[in-house]
Amino acid sequence: MNLEETMPLVFERSIPGRIGFSLPESDVPETNAGDYFDEAYLRSTPADLPELSELEIMRHYTNLSNHNFGVDSGFYPLGSCTMKYNPKINEKVARFPGFANIHPNQPESSVQGALELLYDLQTSLVEITGMDEVTLQPAAGAHGEWTGLMLIRAFHEKNGDTKRTKVIIPDSAHGTNPASAAVAGFDVVTVKSNEKGLVDVADLKKVVGEDTAALMLTNPNTLGLFEKDIVEMAEIVHAAGGKLYYDGANLNAIMAKVRPGDMGFDVVHLNLHKTFTGPHGGGGPGSGPIGVKKELIPFLPTPVLTKKDDAYTFDYNYPDSIGRVKPYYGNFGINVRAYTYIRTMGPDGLKLVTEYAVLNANYMMRKLQDAYDLPFDQVCKHEFVLSGNRQKKLGVRTVDIAKRLLDHNFHPPTVYFPLIVGEAIMIEPTETESKETLDSFIDTMLKIAKEAEENPEIVQEAPHSTYVKRLDETRAARKPVLRYQKEV
């Protein structure tokens, strides 16, 4: 699609002289900016800001919002992303003045309520994960991964075990896992999956050695399958002197049923913006706390939030700490939302979350298994992976199926991931969707499968009803246009 066919940018709508807002007359004396800044930092021409009336601005952004799609708009079965509904009570609590209007440089004594919430959230996450301590510093999932790996690295270095330079990662893992390991200074070793979609324990035994720093796992894995040999894998890694790292992306499948710490994991990161209903989107903020077992506590990033007597305080006395990984809690509001969710649901409610998430995924999988290939035909957890290989033989690719779903007001599932499944379609319904919504999506998927057989062109040319059709996604990824540049 040509850019000329898209909605004009607010800069392109600008008409010189249009006024959208009136400011009161300034009561501050004018001053010369050159008295305070070097000439190199002063503008030679006015800033090219858009000039529009208030009505034009309102219509522009309202029209843009109508072309967005989110969880509040419709079903969003994006596999491995846990796009569950975000309860609006979370928003109400996050907007309490005592939470919304505080500043990071306030004295601890003036923000005891906020610190108490953070401390109680840490305590709740310790209980949910089976860890011994939790830090809320990491900003999001991948940041949590990197932080956890840096703790493991610091642990080995403290023990003089500098030969441990390798992190083992399954071939079905999230792409952030090898990326985080590389950024943390480790070499990545891949362990294969077996014919059941689980980690091949025999292959794990081959790749584990004296140079193993850690094994990173998601359980259930990215195929939505529970790694039933997890205890044996933990024993193998620990016997070799390595650590077991838990990617918490799929915690929604086991929450309040089983704890990573009880499986043998030493480090865990969580995604509060997924499992615990902090909203997705807009590039953040997220929240990626990490939990650790006792022997890794000395290496936690400082300051560590603690409770002394009846007061909450930040403790900097951790000489082996990896240091700060983020200066402030700019994502405090996400933590408030997660805490509200945990307190609202309670232990029994969190258990129901897991049960319904797993039930919904298995229901959908069984309803779709005859129309699409099911690479691993077994009980899944919170998500499942289909394959569009059958449709590919008819000339319809998985990307076509995803685009066709847009015509039915459904966000597409995750596609072409995990990489070990050809034409992968990864579906995660979450626990918050009704049976009626699931049935509607199932009927649409069955209809698309039939169209692939009888009228493939309608699928190949989809979407037909969206404002934007098919973009050059390869060019967008390789040569992105990220800012407006005025034509001269």
Curated annotation (Swiss-Prot):
Gene3D superfamilies membership: 6.20.440.10, Aspartate Aminotransferase, domain 1, Type I PLP-dependent aspartate aminotransferase-like (Major domain)
Pfam families assigned: GcvP2_C (PF21478), GDC-P (PF02347)
Gene Ontology MF terms in the entry: glycine binding; glycine dehydrogenase (decarboxylating) activity; pyridoxal phosphate binding
Modified residues (N6-(pyridoxal phosphate)lysine): K274
Gene Ontology cellular-component terms listed: cytosol; glycine cleavage complex
Cofactor: pyridoxal 5'-phosphate
Catalyzed reaction equations: N(6)-[(R)-lipoyl]-L-lysyl-[glycine-cleavage complex H protein] + glycine + H(+) = N(6)-[(R)-S(8)-aminomethyldihydrolipoyl]-L-lysyl-[glycine-cleavage complex H protein] + CO2
InterPro entries documented for this protein: GcvPB, GDC-P_C, GDC-P_N, GDC_P, PyrdxlP-dep_Trfase, PyrdxlP-dep_Trfase_major, PyrdxlP-dep_Trfase_small
Keywords: Oxidoreductase, Pyridoxal phosphate
Self-association state and partner proteins as the record states: The glycine cleavage system is composed of four proteins: P, T, L and H. In this organism, the P 'protein' is a heterodimer of two subunits.
Family, as annotated: Belongs to the GcvP family. C-terminal subunit subfamily.
Summary of the function given for this chain in its UniProt record: The glycine cleavage system catalyzes the degradation of glycine. The P protein binds the alpha-amino group of glycine through its pyridoxal phosphate cofactor; CO(2) is released and the remaining methylamine moiety is then transferred to the lipoamide cofactor of the H protein.
Protein name (database record): Probable glycine dehydrogenase (decarboxylating) subunit 2
Gene name tied to this protein: gcvPB
